[in-house]
């Protein structure tokens, strides 16, 4: 196995993603296979595969395409699913830690892991730190809707948020939607208990007012309710981590219930089975639309580097999709674009309050 750094190994025109080979329920097998699938779709991408070399060697022999586009860095320790974040922070030779360190040292532009969520979030925040002007990173993910894929954030990284946090999430969501969903002017909504302007608490109303006077004013739809998420009223739904996580888990539970009910209904009688055969084409499209693998890959946005969290129980196709998300974020310079968005917000805030300090931070701090 090559010991040189990923940055040395590949030419300057390619970008490198660090892969935590040991994270997830079925690692490292599905990780290497998923990386191989992603490599076929993205021939310019290169990988720094971090994990136990003795386990990775036979897998890379099985997937020569993956072997040809990666270097391996030995990491003998795995962060387990039951491990507390504090314990994971002490494991300096874990595959997760070394993969994130590679991003911090400039050897990789992003990291993908299917490992312990709490440990990944804690390590990423401490090692990579937030971008200038960002108070807190947010967890963002793609979800299905009646009008196509949408983006929602925060999904649980921040339970309590102030107005400025929500505005930062909107800026980061705008960049994510442009980078991954390919939208030129994503419509942005704030999740609230009603769509009327007077609804919600001071925190959510202040955030809405800040967005109406920001560079995202033309894209800001206003308040959205729970049913607007599935309806696709906006392309980006912004929420605090408490509300966002509940909305996500509710959507996942509803999708599972729907799948179970359809299976129960279409296997209940002979006529029902016949009905399934007649409706098979449409039902297969519905199954594909609801396939969680299509939406695998939540991103911790707002850090100095791209961090993608894959579902721990996914298969190779699902992990490959998480890698796809990481590649989209890196190739579209998402971190740079978030910096630009924050700079515009500060500039507009300063222009609106010229008597305050030059960078507008007094007005922004007032919103906390």
Swiss-Prot record:
Keywords: Cytoplasm, Lipid biosynthesis, Lipid metabolism, Phospholipid biosynthesis, Phospholipid metabolism, Transferase. Its main location: cytoplasm. It catalyses: a fatty acyl-[ACP] + phosphate = an acyl phosphate + holo-[ACP]. GO terms for biological process: fatty acid biosynthetic process; phospholipid biosynthetic process. Its EC number is 2.3.1.274. Pathway: Lipid metabolism; phospholipid metabolism. GO terms for molecular function: phosphate:acyl-[acyl carrier protein] acyltransferase activity. It comes from the Bacteria. Belongs to the PlsX family. This is Phosphate acyltransferase. It comes from Granulibacter bethesdensis (strain ATCC BAA-1260 / CGDNIH1). The lineage of its organism: Bacteria, Pseudomonadati, Pseudomonadota, Alphaproteobacteria, Acetobacterales.
